[in-house]
Swiss-Prot record:
Name the UniProt record assigns to this protein: 4-hydroxy-tetrahydrodipicolinate reductase
Top-rank taxon, per record: Bacteria
Reaction(s) catalysed by this chain's protein: (S)-2,3,4,5-tetrahydrodipicolinate + NAD(+) + H2O = (2S,4S)-4-hydroxy-2,3,4,5-tetrahydrodipicolinate + NADH + H(+); (S)-2,3,4,5-tetrahydrodipicolinate + NADP(+) + H2O = (2S,4S)-4-hydroxy-2,3,4,5-tetrahydrodipicolinate + NADPH + H(+)
UniProt keyword Nucleus, yes or no: no
EC number: 1.17.1.8
Subcellular location: Cytoplasm
One example GO MF annotation: NADP binding
Active site: 155 (proton donor/acceptor), 159 (proton donor)
Pfam families referenced in this protein's UniProt entry, alphabetically: DapB_C, DapB_N
TM helices/strands, residue ranges: none
Protein family per UniProt: Belongs to the DapB family.
GO biological process: diaminopimelate biosynthetic process; lysine biosynthetic process via diaminopimelate
C-alpha cells in the first residue's frame, strides 16, 4: 500500500484527487492539508470530497506528518509547491507536482531536489495530453519548416497563469523536434499592426472564460491544408487519475526527475 498526502485538499483539484485515490487500488489517503487558518481545518477529507467519511482530518502542516505518507501530490501554487518540495526533500519522500506557472529559477530548484528524491513533474497529468505530445513530436518532424505553427489554449476564468503549462510544454516539444529554442521563437498574442508573420515562429493564444476545464490545439498550417492536434478535457478527473497513477509508479523509484512520458512508458 502506498500512503498519499494531498496538499490543497479543499480546492477543486484537491477534492478530485481525494476521489481518484478512493477509486484506485493500492493507494491510501493518510494526510490531507490546507493552508493555515483555513475554515476547512478539522473537516473530514472524504466528506469534503463527497466520497464519505475517511477518518482523515484536514490539517495544516504536512511537515508534522511526514512519517504518515510515502508520496505527496501537489497542484497548488509555485511558492507553496516549493515549500512542500523542501519538506519532501528533507524527509526523503517522493512527490508528484502538477502545479504550473514556475519561473526558470523555480524549475531549477525542482531539478536540484530531484537529485535527492524521486519527483514526477508534469504540467499535465492526462494520458490523452501526453499521447498528444508524442503526436506533436511526430507531426513537427514530418511537416518541418513548411508550416506555420500556432498553439491555442482555453481554461476557466480562475486560472492565474498564461499560457498554460501544457501549452508551453506542447510548444517546447514542437520546438525541440525542429531544432529551435522556444524562448527565441515564441510569440505570445498579437495586437495592432504586426506585419507579416515571421517564419519559424511558434504563436500562442490564450482564452480564459467560464468553467472550461482545459482545451489545447496545436495547428500546423501550410498552403492548401492544415493539421490540428486537439485535446479537450471535460473533467478534472482525467488529471487526477494521471496524478494518482504517477504516485503509484513513484513508490520504490530512485531519486530523479521524471514526467508523465516516463510514467506511461512513452519514451
Amino acid at each position: 500500500m502506498t500512503n498519499i498526502c494531498i496538499v490543497g485538499a479543499g480546492g477543486r483539484m484537491g477534492r478530485t484527487l481525494i476521489e481518484a485515490i478512493q477509486q484506485a487500488e493500492g493507494l491510501d489517503l493518510t494526510v490531507a492539508t490546507e493552508r493555515a487558518g483555513s475554515s476547512l481545518i478539522g473537516a473530514d477529507a472524504g466528506e469534503l470530497a463527497g466520497v464519505g467519511r475517511l477518518g482523515v482530518a484536514i490539517s495544516e502542516d504536512p511537515a508534522a506528518q511526514v512519517a504518515a505518507f510515502d508520496v505527496l501530490i501537489d497542484f497548488t501554487r509555485p511558492e507553496g509547491t516549493l515549500a512542500h518540495l523542501e519538506i519532501c526533500r528533507k524527509a526523503g519522500r517522493a512527490m508528484v507536482i502538477g502545479t504550473t506557472g514556475f519561473t526558470e529559477a523555480q524549475k531549477q530548484t525542482i531539478r536540484e531536489a530531484a537529485k535527492e528524491i524521486p519527483v514526477v513533474f508534469a504540467p499535465n497529468m492526462s494520458v490523452g495530453v501526453n499521447l498528444c505530445l508524442k503526436l506533436l513530436d511526430l507531426a513537427a518532424r514530418v511537416l518541418g519548416d513548411e508550416v506555420d505553427i500556432e498553439v491555442i489554449e482555453a481554461h476557466h476564468r480562475h486560472k492565474v497563469d498564461a499560457p498554460s503549462g501544457t501549452a508551453l510544454r506542447m510548444g517546447e516539444v514542437v520546438a525541440e523536434a525542429l531544432g529551435r529554442d522556444l524562448a527565441q521563437c515564441a510569440v505570445y498574442g498579437r495586437e495592432g499592426h504586426t506585419g507579416e508573420r515571421e517564419r519559424k515562429t511558434i504563436g500562442f493564444e490564450t482564452i480564459r472564460a467560464g468553467d472550461i476545464v482545459g482545451e489545447h490545439t496545436v495547428m500546423f498550417a501550410g498552403i492548401g491544408e492544415r493539421v490540428e492536434i486537439t485535446h479537450k478535457a471535460s473533467s478534472r478527473m482525467t488529471f487526477a487519475k494521471g496524478a494518482v497513477r504517477a504516485a503509484a509508479w513513484l513508490k520504490g523509484r530512485s531519486a530523479g526527475l521524471y514526467d508523465m512520458q516516463d510514467v506511461l512508458d512513452l519514451r
